[in-house]
Protein backbone atom coordinates (compact mmCIF):
# COMPACT_ATOMS: atom_id res chain seq x y z
CA UNK A 1 0.00 0.00 0.00
CA UNK A 2 2.09 2.89 -1.31
CA UNK A 3 0.17 6.19 -1.76
CA UNK A 4 2.41 7.42 -4.61
CA UNK A 5 1.70 4.28 -6.63
CA UNK A 6 -2.03 4.56 -5.98
CA UNK A 7 -1.94 8.26 -6.92
CA UNK A 8 -0.44 7.37 -10.31
CA UNK A 9 -2.92 4.53 -10.90
CA UNK A 10 -0.24 1.83 -11.00
CA UNK A 11 -1.59 -1.68 -10.48
CA UNK A 12 0.64 -4.48 -9.18
CA UNK A 13 -0.55 -7.49 -11.17
CA UNK A 14 1.94 -10.12 -10.01
CA UNK A 15 4.82 -10.20 -7.50
CA UNK A 16 7.52 -12.85 -7.52
CA UNK A 17 11.09 -13.40 -6.40
CA UNK A 18 12.22 -13.70 -10.04
CA UNK A 19 9.57 -11.71 -11.94
CA UNK A 20 6.90 -9.13 -11.22
CA UNK A 21 4.38 -7.38 -13.46
CA UNK A 22 2.86 -3.92 -12.99
CA UNK A 23 0.74 -1.81 -15.30
CA UNK A 24 -0.89 1.57 -15.67
CA UNK A 25 -3.65 2.64 -18.04
CA UNK A 26 -2.74 5.89 -19.76
CA UNK A 27 -4.81 8.96 -19.02
CA UNK A 28 -4.39 12.67 -19.65
CA UNK A 29 -2.82 13.38 -16.23
CA UNK A 30 0.11 11.06 -17.04
CA UNK A 31 1.05 12.78 -20.30
CA UNK A 32 3.92 15.13 -21.05
CA UNK A 33 3.17 18.39 -22.93
CA UNK A 34 3.27 16.47 -26.25
CA UNK A 35 0.53 13.96 -25.40
CA UNK A 36 2.92 11.07 -24.72
CA UNK A 37 3.46 9.09 -21.52
CA UNK A 38 5.62 11.26 -19.27
CA UNK A 39 9.18 9.97 -18.85
CA UNK A 40 8.73 10.20 -15.09
CA UNK A 41 5.86 7.73 -15.33
CA UNK A 42 8.03 5.20 -17.17
CA UNK A 43 10.81 5.72 -14.63
CA UNK A 44 8.33 5.25 -11.79
CA UNK A 45 7.20 1.96 -13.35
CA UNK A 46 10.81 0.77 -13.60
CA UNK A 47 11.65 1.80 -10.03
CA UNK A 48 8.44 0.35 -8.60
CA UNK A 49 8.81 -2.95 -10.46
CA UNK A 50 12.37 -3.26 -9.17
CA UNK A 51 11.24 -2.49 -5.64
CA UNK A 52 8.35 -4.93 -5.47
CA UNK A 53 10.50 -7.68 -6.97
CA UNK A 54 13.25 -7.07 -4.43
CA UNK A 55 10.74 -7.00 -1.56
CA UNK A 56 9.24 -10.33 -2.62
CA UNK A 57 11.70 -11.95 -0.19
CA UNK A 58 9.95 -10.21 2.71
CA UNK A 59 12.74 -7.73 3.46
CA UNK A 60 12.78 -3.91 3.29
CA UNK A 61 14.56 -2.22 0.37
CA UNK A 62 15.28 1.26 -0.93
CA UNK A 63 16.57 2.24 -4.35
CA UNK A 64 20.36 2.57 -4.36
CA UNK A 65 20.76 3.20 -8.09
CA UNK A 66 18.52 3.24 -11.14
CA UNK A 67 19.03 3.81 -14.84
CA UNK A 68 16.68 3.85 -17.78
CA UNK A 69 16.84 3.96 -21.56
CA UNK A 70 13.79 5.51 -23.22
CA UNK A 71 13.25 3.77 -26.56
CA UNK A 72 9.77 4.65 -27.87
CA UNK A 73 6.82 6.78 -26.85
CA UNK A 74 3.33 5.70 -25.86
CA UNK A 75 0.19 7.79 -26.18
CA UNK A 76 -2.67 5.54 -25.09
CA UNK A 77 -3.62 2.17 -23.68
CA UNK A 78 -1.99 0.01 -21.06
CA UNK A 79 1.70 0.32 -20.24
CA UNK A 80 3.24 -2.73 -18.55
CA UNK A 81 6.47 -3.13 -16.61
CA UNK A 82 7.91 -6.64 -16.33
CA UNK A 83 10.87 -7.19 -14.01
CA UNK A 84 13.44 -9.97 -13.83
CA UNK A 85 15.88 -10.49 -10.98
CA UNK A 86 19.51 -10.38 -12.12
CA UNK A 87 21.08 -11.05 -8.73
CA UNK A 88 19.75 -11.34 -5.20
CA UNK A 89 22.40 -10.94 -2.51
CA UNK A 90 22.45 -10.37 1.23
CA UNK A 91 22.53 -6.57 0.96
CA UNK A 92 21.87 -5.76 -2.71
CA UNK A 93 19.37 -6.99 -5.28
CA UNK A 94 19.65 -6.03 -8.96
CA UNK A 95 16.56 -6.11 -11.16
CA UNK A 96 16.13 -5.50 -14.91
CA UNK A 97 12.80 -4.07 -16.08
CA UNK A 98 11.22 -3.87 -19.54
CA UNK A 99 8.36 -1.44 -20.14
CA UNK A 100 6.04 -2.30 -23.04
CA UNK A 101 2.78 -1.10 -24.55
CA UNK A 102 -0.28 -3.15 -25.52
CA UNK A 103 1.37 -4.10 -28.82
CA UNK A 104 4.44 -5.44 -26.97
CA UNK A 105 6.60 -2.58 -28.27
CA UNK A 106 9.55 -1.98 -25.96
CA UNK A 107 9.14 1.57 -24.63
CA UNK A 108 11.92 1.60 -22.05
CA UNK A 109 14.46 -0.66 -20.43
CA UNK A 110 15.87 -0.05 -16.98
CA UNK A 111 18.01 -1.53 -14.24
CA UNK A 112 17.36 -0.95 -10.55
CA UNK A 113 19.79 -1.70 -7.74
CA UNK A 114 17.98 -2.11 -4.43
CA UNK A 115 19.67 -1.88 -1.02
CA UNK A 116 18.33 -4.08 1.78
CA UNK A 117 17.67 -2.10 4.98
CA UNK A 118 17.43 -5.17 7.18
CA UNK A 119 20.27 -7.23 5.69
CA UNK A 120 21.87 -7.83 9.09
CA UNK A 121 18.79 -9.78 10.16
CA UNK A 122 18.65 -11.81 6.95
CA UNK A 123 19.49 -15.42 6.24
CA UNK A 124 19.89 -14.76 2.49
CA UNK A 125 23.39 -15.65 1.33
CA UNK A 126 25.21 -13.48 -1.20
Show which residues each predicted segment covers.
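Terminal targeting signals and extreme-terminal segments of soluble enzymes
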Residues: 1-126
Amino acid sequence: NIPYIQFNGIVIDRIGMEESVLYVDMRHELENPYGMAHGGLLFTLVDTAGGVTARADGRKYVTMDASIHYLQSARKGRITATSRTVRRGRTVTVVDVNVTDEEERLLARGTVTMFCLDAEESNVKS
